Amino acid sequence: MRNSDLAPLYRSAIGFDRLFNLLESGQNQSNGGYPPYNVELVDENNYRIAIAVAGFAEQELEITTQDNLLIVRGSHANEPAQRTYLYQGIAERNFERKFQLAEHIKIKGANLVNGLLYIDLERLVPESLKPRRIEIK
């Protein structure tokens, strides 16, 4: 019987390669997938999370990190007056979205454009973990 060692495949998954699996685990929260988000590959070491936060002003959004956990919260300062809707398709509720980040990830910044909150991420692999060429003498 032949055994396959998959460890070399996991060794190449430093940082962001594992990020997608970790982000999916954050999707299993009780918020029912609200607000929706995308994860975009910008280049080899840069990623962007886009979160749909229509209806929230910049001062109503909070982004924090603790250990390897990115937390995005949205809360309306003034609750809207009681309204009678014929149809309500736009969610106006407060939210908290958590993302488990992989190792060696730095949050570069965030900006709010047209109802989308963009969070830019960068993979910074320490020199000690990067491949290096050994000279043969």
Curated annotation (Swiss-Prot):
It comes from the Bacteria. It holds the Pfam family HSP20. Residues 28-137 form the sHSP domain. Keywords: Chaperone, Cytoplasm, Stress response. One of its GO terms (biological process) is protein stabilization. InterPro entries: A-crystallin/Hsp20_dom (IPR002068), ACD_IbpA/B (IPR037913), HSP20-like_chaperone (IPR008978), HSP20_IbpA (IPR023728). One of its GO terms (cellular component) is cytoplasm. It is found in: Cytoplasm. The keyword NADP does not apply. Belongs to the small heat shock protein (HSP20) family. Associates with aggregated proteins, together with IbpB, to stabilize and protect them from irreversible denaturation and extensive proteolysis during heat shock and oxidative stress. Aggregated proteins bound to the IbpAB complex are more efficiently refolded and reactivated by the ATP-dependent chaperone systems ClpB and DnaK/DnaJ/GrpE. Its activity is ATP-independent. Monomer. Forms homomultimers of about 100-150 subunits at optimal growth temperatures. Conformation changes to monomers at high temperatures or high ionic concentrations. This is Small heat shock protein IbpA. The gene is ibpA.
